Amino acid sequence: MNFLQPIGRTFFNALAGLGRLTLFAGSGFVNIVRPPYYPRLVLKQMVEIGFYSLPVVGLTAIFTGMVLALQSFTGFSRFSAESAIPNVVVVSITRELGPVLASLMVAGRIGAAMAAEIGTMRVTDQIDALTTLSTNPMRYLVAPRLLAGVTMVPILVLVADIVGVFGGYLLSIYKLGFNPSTYLHNTFDFLKVDDVVSGLVKAAVFGFLVALMGCYHGFHSKGGAQGVGTATTNAVVSASILILISDYVVTELFFSR
């Protein structure tokens, strides 16, 4: 029976970790709506998440749209169905690729930065100092980041949708020889509000998860510089996994009927 002990220990540790994460997320959500508020900190995080992430999100989106159009042309040309390319590009970008890829880029950039910053504050006792000064660390450090993540990632995804569809348009017009007006007509004819809304809902969920994992792993880091590095890695990996899992859940809610 000794071989069952590591399995049981791992299982209960996982449950304990899930419980801590759930309590942390609940506390962070409550502190978003409970005063005092820190608008300057929220604005700072919005700029960090939104404005400074635009280049990497834009580059990812435009080349994703171009590759998607090129790959679609390669497949559809065998069946003389090239006219379906605008439809495939706009649906794929708005429903899936825009929200998921933009959020993964944000997770790699912002999730790591949050974990490193808060983790450094933890190992250097700055968080304990905030508590000593009667400042709630959850309200001061975590809530502004969660609010900024929920607010700015949907905006980034909206930009990614536009840039990604534009990338597919550019490649289709200048390389594949599509008629510009026909391509735009097919794109707008097939674009549905539900597709955009589902992508933005996903983006809000993803933004919350990215900020949550960055704050959680940074908040619970220990062991000096090595611990901060581990927390940073764990934040990016866990945020990426949760993005993919929640992507399926939200897709099921929107499109299973």
Task: Name what the model sees in each region.
Residues 232-246, 250, 254-257:
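Helical hairpin unit composed of two closely spaced alpha helices linked by a short loop
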